[in-house]
């Protein structure tokens, strides 16, 4: 098992490139199941979750391999028939595995998918996925830890469905299923994240008829067949946001290439409020951290609000603020597990339910810490970069689920960071 070792307190200078978005790539790769033939998905990050989904497709009878001629390209061949099952052994570590459910039942009329795993950050129910698919005519059974879905008529049928709560993967799952359903589907109270817009764009390139992605209502006119996919995945706004937060640490000056301002506006607003200078540059954003951050209050919300996936990284920055900040988590339960580890570095944080009060300190001090989930691990890396002395981040398999060799991206900026065997 690996650990990340950081000798902190060194200013960061330079430019870093953003990888493709994991949370866009995964549903787009799953969407390839909707059409027979050879698919090419470009700008796909080399991450554990992506590799797991590739193994799942191979288990089903597809071929999936990296295209040696193009960095970041994933070639997928989908046959006329597959084994429509996602077994627990393959998907136990990846919550996003549930996105194969919609494509499988839409194209082959049946699916058996293990209930998802992934980060342990509270309740992430898939009931909205199942209600949406039921509205399209699927019959759902939960048995022995699996979701079994069938289309009794052979094909799903269009319907109007309102999500009880906004759900990104739920919106994606039902939208993909509706693409091959008979008739029109109207989805209401949809999630609005950029990754949903990118998935819709990929499906439209396959011949789907989808409008409204990125808004509250999405309309899908079902078609009988789709064609193979060739699509470039958008940049990862959370990875970009993590590097923006690194640039906002005191004394740093970092340019994040490939970062789309419209995707990170809520974060940029808070970074500027904290005193960082954020400047649009050709192909990205430049962030300059000038002295200790100012305290700011942050409240997470679905897109276009402040992303829950940036809450931990923002907390790491505010640990050094000149004053007290309040962070309120409204999206997920149990998402302050990084607090105890930040406290080991000298942070002063008090948690009361869904709110954390961060009393800034002049400096942090390096120490061994342990990652509890994906974004918590990123927060610990940021804190370690700013801390005086050596920080060791353990259980970095969490980090590898969402960041493509983060140490290799930070080192050219001047960070004294390396990966070692724990």
Curated annotation (Swiss-Prot):
Keywords: Cell cycle, Cell division, Cell shape, Cell wall biogenesis/degradation, Cytoplasm, Peptidoglycan synthesis, Pyruvate, Transferase. Phosphoenolpyruvate binds at residues 22-23. The modification 2-(S-cysteinyl)pyruvic acid O-phosphothioketal is found at residue 119. GO terms for molecular function: UDP-N-acetylglucosamine 1-carboxyvinyltransferase activity. Its EC number is 2.5.1.7. Its main location: cytoplasm. Pathway: Cell wall biogenesis; peptidoglycan biosynthesis. It is found in: Cytoplasm. The active site is at 119 (proton donor). InterPro entries: Enolpyruvate_Tfrase_dom, Enolpyruvate_Tfrase_sf, MurA_subfamily, RNA3'P_cycl/enolpyr_Trfase_a/b, UDP_GlcNAc_COvinyl_MurA. Pfam families: EPSP_synthase. The keyword Cell wall biogenesis/degradation applies. Disulfide bonds: none annotated. GO terms for biological process: cell division; cell wall organization; peptidoglycan biosynthetic process; regulation of cell shape; UDP-N-acetylgalactosamine biosynthetic process. It catalyses: phosphoenolpyruvate + UDP-N-acetyl-alpha-D-glucosamine = UDP-N-acetyl-3-O-(1-carboxyvinyl)-alpha-D-glucosamine + phosphate. One of its GO terms (cellular component) is cytoplasm. UDP-N-acetyl-alpha-D-glucosamine binds at residues 95, 124-128, 309, 331. Coiled coil: none annotated. Cell wall formation. Adds enolpyruvyl to UDP-N-acetylglucosamine. PANTHER family: UDP-N-ACETYLGLUCOSAMINE 1-CARBOXYVINYLTRANSFERASE (PTHR43783:SF1). Belongs to the EPSP synthase family. MurA subfamily. HAMAP family: MurA. This is UDP-N-acetylglucosamine 1-carboxyvinyltransferase. It comes from Anaeromyxobacter sp. (strain Fw109-5). The gene is murA.
